[in-house]
Swiss-Prot record:
Coiled coil: none annotated. [2Fe-2S] cluster binds at residues 104, 110, 113, 150. Signal peptide: none annotated. GO terms for cellular component: mitochondrial matrix; mitochondrion. GO terms for biological process: cellular response to cAMP; cellular response to forskolin; cholesterol metabolic process; electron transport chain; hormone biosynthetic process; P450-containing electron transport chain; respiratory electron transport chain; steroid biosynthetic process. The modification Phosphoserine is found at residues 61, 175. Keywords: 2Fe-2S, Acetylation, Cholesterol metabolism, Electron transport, Iron, Iron-sulfur, Lipid metabolism, Metal-binding, Mitochondrion, Phosphoprotein, Steroid metabolism, Steroidogenesis, Sterol metabolism, Transit peptide, Transport. This is Adrenodoxin, mitochondrial. It comes from Bos taurus. The modification N6-succinyllysine is found at residues 64, 156.
């Protein structure tokens, strides 16, 4: 959870510095917080810790690579992305014209950032997780080179790669079966 918060915070802050306050609840049982001292920090007390999150002061061109997206209309959108950023981050930060892309904002709750990779790039990607695979099962236009853009982070080896957005989009959040007694909320 903390790692995800840091990733989201880093993406939101970009190259600016920010400060985040994290609340840590004590573990159940006697003794309160591990390592706490003094009265008032046991039981149900809440300790506050300040965490500083900051990006690099300036991004050099060496830290960026070129990525080509082919959107649903067949138009090629070329942009730059920072090494380490996800493909979802690249689309959002560069305001690329890809309708509905990243509806869940990278929380692995939809499949709207479904992308199809070139074979030579696909072979270099990190192994797919079970969670990503479950979301991809709900995606339209699934291929053997499909991945979710929110799960793929840029590396130097991806420079000048081309990824294709499938012709149709599917949002897994809209295809959840709520059971026989559920009604559609409009």
């Amino acid at each position: 959870m903390a790692a995800r918060l840091l990733r989201v915070a880093s993406a939101a802050l970009g190259d600016t510095a920010g400060r985040w306050r994290l609340l840590a609840r004590p573990r159940a049982g006697a003794g309160g917080l591990r390592g706490s001292r003094g009265p008032g920090l046991g039981g149900g007390a809440v300790a506050t810790r300040t965490l500083s999150v900051s990006g690099r002061a300036q991004s050099s061109s060496e830290d960026k690579i070129t990525v080509h997206f082919i959107n649903r209309d067949g138009e090629t959108l070329t942009t730059k992305g920072k090494i380490g950023d996800s493909l979802l981050d690249v689309v959002v930060q560069n305001n690329l014209d890809i309708d509905g892309f990243g509806a869940c904002e990278g929380t692995l709750a939809c499949s709207t950032c479904h992308l199809i990779f070139e074979q030579h790039i696909f072979e270099k990607l990190e192994a797919i997780t079970d969670e990503e695979n479950d979301m991809l099962d709900l995606a339209y236009g699934l291929t053997d080179r499909s991945r979710l853009g929110c799960q793929i982070c840029l590396t130097k080896a991806m420079d000048n790669m081309t990824v294709r957005v499938p012709d149709a989009v599917s949002d897994a959040r809209e295809s959840i079966d709520m059971g026989m007694n559920s009604s559609k909320i409009e």
